Amino acid sequence: DGNRGQANYAASKAGIIGLTKSVAKELGSRGICCNAIAPGLIETDMTGGMTDNEEVLAHIPLARPGKPEEVAMLAAFLAESDYITGEVIRIDGGMTL
C-alpha cells in the first residue's frame, strides 16, 4: 500500500519483494533460500516519538511497537530454515491485517 509522497519508498519495497521471489527461484535448485522481512513499527532511534503515539498504536492490534530483538529472532529462525523460501514475512503486530 502506498502513501502520498512516498512513491520512491513504495517502489523500493516492491523491488525487494520481486528480487526476493526471483532469487528464491533462481537459487533454490542449489539449496539456497531467500526471504524478506517486512517490519512494521519497531522501537529504534529512527522511529523516535512514534512508538508512544496513541494514534499510531491504535492501528496495531497488539497495541505496542515491536522490539529489535523480535526482528532478530525472526531473522535467526529464517537463517536456520531449509524449507522456507521466496516469502515476505511481516512482523508488525498485526498492523497490516
For the regions a language model picked out, list residue spans one by one:
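Short, flexible catalytic-loop segment of classical short-chain dehydrogenase/reductase
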Residues: 17, 38-49
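Active-site helix of classical SDR
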Residues: 12, 20
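Conserved SDR Rossmann-fold cofactor-binding beta-strand/turn motif
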Residues: 33-39, 43, 90-92
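Cytosolic ligand/metal-binding cores
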Residues: 7
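Conserved active-site motif detector
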Residues: 3
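Alpha-helical segment proximal to the catalytic Tyr-Lys
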Residues: 25-29
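Catalytic Tyr-x(3-8)-Lys segment
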Residues: 52-70
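C-terminal substrate-recognition "lid" of short-chain dehydrogenase/reductases
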Residues: 67-91, 96
